Amino acid sequence: RDRNNLRLLNLERQNLIAAKENHEIAKERYLLGDLSGIEMREAQKSLLDAEERILSAEYDTKMCEISLLQISGKITEYLK
């Protein structure tokens, strides 16, 4: 499960980079009048969704790490 969380986190990091790049392109096109307001909002929403997914993946990964530390009895070392 931990490996899956790490893979997902890495994928979401890549997705966030792509979403940021797409958002920048959309902003430039919008300022040039080559993109509608609705399309700009869609690009903004895609970026927000990517940010939300990465936060969720980071949380899930950290919770998995903490669970493993609890199971292994090393949680007190982690908390120091």
Task: Explain the meaning of each model-derived region.
Residues 1-53, 60-71:
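Amphipathic alpha-helical coiled-coil segments
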Residues 69-80:
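Terminal intrinsically disordered/low-complexity segments used for targeting and assembly
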